[in-house]
């Protein structure tokens, strides 16, 4: 039994028919070797297929192989282990301009005050979506203008509140218990994903018009990249940006180095 959606099945069948079947469909599965798979990889690269697509094809093949192995049709490990796949570059490049931020925040405010506030907080602190969702009043210090952010690995760092984020949080703050979340869903529970309002608004504003590379697409995480990019453009040194973002190594922060002013 599987929990796969029909769309996932459709894509896997399509990929199998387009790429795997022409090269290895005539072979008994036990006869398929790394050499056959190398030919598939080369053909995909020659036709300009992205590393992500190649990895998806090989993942589809692994599923078939693992099923065959589970049913004693084959006994050895999948030949994909001997094929070096191209690496996927998932480093996002996009950040918002000041004009884009202004129109985005204005549009969000008219649709959802909460999505506006979460977007503003991420733009001004560099917080990841998960850090925004986990923010409690106990780690927000309105007197000192700071907030303590905790990433998915349990590592804490301090964020410094701008006038805009300070004002926004002051409007939200009442006499909440320190353990209470700053942002909650309609039932008062922890938010688990950003509202579709963000994506719809980005689309309505045309912020992704003409964008074909997924790394250039404007998504909620673009707010974090915008925070970092603006800091570097304003002359903040990379080591300070590293600390503000909570990066584990300076190499992660160096993606912004080309934005430094001359």
Annotate each PLM feature.
Residues 1-73, 90-92, 111-113, 155, ...:
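N-terminal core-binding DNA-recognition domain of tyrosine site-specific recombinases/integrases
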Residues 15, 36-39, 100, 131, ...:
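Ca2+-coordinating acidic residues in Ca2+-binding motifs
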Residues 47, 102, 106-116, 125, ...:
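Short, basic (Lys/Arg/His-rich) helix/loop patches that form interaction surfaces
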Residues 47, 51, 55-57, 70-129, ...:
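Basic, Lys/Arg- and aromatic-enriched nucleic-acid-binding interface segment
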Residues 37, 61, 97, 198, ...:
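Mobile genetic element proteins and their domesticated derivatives, centered on retroelements
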Residues 95, 148-154, 164, 245-262:
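Catalytic-site neighborhood detector that most strongly recognizes the C-terminal catalytic loop/helix
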